[in-house]
Amino acid sequence: MTLGGGLLLIGIAIIQWAKKLMGDHEIVELRHAAGSEKDDIDAVLDDINAGIEESGIARRPLIRNSLLGAMAALGLPAIVLLRDMGPLPHGHTNTVWKKGMRVVNDVSGKPIKPSDLEVGQLVNAQPAVFFETDEHGQHLYHGAELHAAKAKAAAIVVRMRPEDITPSAGRANWGVDGILCYSKICTHVGCPISLWEQQTHHLLCPCHQSTFDLADNGKVIFGPAGRALPQLPISVDSEGYLVAVSDFPEIVTPSYPELARDQKKLDKKFGGNN
């Protein structure tokens, strides 16, 4: 009741303000050119010249040159700040995947065999190097380096019926018995995706609903993503485990302005056959 009464009184006050205190006639203000009049410009220049003459800077070169030198030195801190930004990024078009690296379960680190997958199944995967250790038992990747590498190398492995897959030119041998491996990173803004529709072979991004057809080379069929999901060529090693044939021939990243330029560089590395 109190709140309702307060709102009512506020409404009445607004109405009274509009009726009694605010003017009811229109006022027109003429618009003028944004630039200053020539007379005003000349007057300002005359004032500046008069100030220079009164200060005597023109007759005192030491003071003038010291002032100019001090103004030039103001740019030096900017150079120091630019150096503090750190080294320029490099290797952003690559991931840790390479020829012969095993595809492993992203939780257990267990290598994956084709027999481990059923038709319609999806497994979240990573490169085996993330689980490898050195002679001291320390993981090869750890801390910020591990997180940065995982952000680009995360993958999904799916199995479909071979007859349902329509590979594009040059990709006929990128899979094993209907098993394909794709990047887990959405090409829109980089969200990790693994919402898998078994019947349609579609992969849905939960962030902005970009949808990719994994049976059709990761093609975008809905949503804001601007390019297909990168595919990792895979085969099996001598022990029957899934391994990468190479790194991703396409850049694993959200879209950015220089992407086309960087992709051309990567195409040259892979011979342009992707």
Roles of regions detected by a PLM:
Residues 3-14, 71-82:
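Alpha-helical membrane-embedded segments
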Residues 188, 196, 209-214:
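Structured cytosolic domains appended to multi-pass membrane proteins
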Residues 186, 205:
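Short cysteine-rich clusters marking metal-coordination/redox-active sites
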Residues 197-200, 224-225:
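Short linker/helix segments within small regulatory modules
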Residues 16-47, 84-185, 191-196, 235-274:
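N-terminal pre-ligand scaffold of iron-sulfur
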Residues 52-70:
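N-terminal secretory signal peptides and thylakoid transit peptides that target proteins
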Residues 4-28, 60, 64:
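Transmembrane alpha-helices and immediately adjacent membrane-cytoplasm interface residues
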Residues 213-251:
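Short Fe-S-cluster ligation motifs
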